[in-house]
Amino acid sequence: MPKHGKKYLAALAKVDRTRLYSPTEALALVKETSYTKFDGTVEAHLRLGIDPRHADQNIRTTVALPHGTGKTVRVLVFAQGEAVQAALDAGADYAGSDDLIARIDRENFFDFDVAIATPDMMGKVGRIGRKLGPRGLMPNPKSGTIVPAADLARTIREVKGGRVEIRNDKTGILHVAIGKVSFTPQQLSENFVALMDAVKAAKPSGAKGTYIRSVTLTSTMGPGVPVDPVAAQNLKA
């Protein structure tokens, strides 16, 4: 096991691992136990009662966090014609067609966080799917990143404003950033409520037994704070 430093151990000592905290208590404790010099990210980790081996039980959806994540999101748009300039005018960091595809393919250009595409571009974008897919950058209708040209501006604004993708890993756990340590408790709470509501709404019909089995809140490099999953699901903004 990796050895932890004194600051981490001091933070860990403030967390009672034998109890489940209310969301309000947990968020306060996450802020208190953050010890990084930079403004750390607050993350929620949810273990779900799903079987990721079955495609129909995997979670892939989006949620618009009311206060965003506190992170500057770099957006790349695959489009052509007038849609390219429209995307740039709406705030996209990069927009183009064959030029961007070639740059990604030849230069391994990945200086962006989210890729959006119009449907007519997917035939070309598919050629670099082997590079975009493993990085979680492949446009997908389930994540709301394949949209008609008329919806580009709205989608770009939503992504820039705090819309995040929710997607379980291969063990059935969600890892979602819900803000920064510098956020107020109210901002973090409202973002957390939005996340929980989205996860509940995305419950697969094939999921058996308890759906949300455990919830943990943490900050960058900080200790995990266990949360009562029932209280987390009942929390209101």
UniProtKB/Swiss-Prot annotation:
Entry superkingdom: Bacteria
InterPro entries associated with the record: Ribosom_uL1_bac-type, Ribosomal_uL1, Ribosomal_uL1-like, Ribosomal_uL1/biogenesis, Ribosomal_uL1_3-a/b-sand, Ribosomal_uL1_CS
GO biological-process terms attached to the record: regulation of translation; translation
Gene3D superfamilies: 3.30.190.20, 3.40.50.790
One annotated GO molecular function: rRNA binding
Keyword Lipoprotein included in the entry's annotation: no
Keywords: Repressor, Ribonucleoprotein, Ribosomal protein, RNA-binding, rRNA-binding, Translation regulation, tRNA-binding
SUPFAM superfamilies: Ribosomal protein L1
Entry GO terms, CC: large ribosomal subunit
Biological role stated in the UniProt entry: Binds directly to 23S rRNA. The L1 stalk is quite mobile in the ribosome, and is involved in E site tRNA release. Protein L1 is also a translational repressor protein, it controls the translation of the L11 operon by binding to its mRNA.
Similarity comment text for this entry: Belongs to the universal ribosomal protein uL1 family.
Database matches in NCBIfam families: rplA_bact
HAMAP family: Ribosomal_uL1_B
Subunit structure: Part of the 50S ribosomal subunit.
Protein name: Large ribosomal subunit protein uL1
Name of the gene: rplA
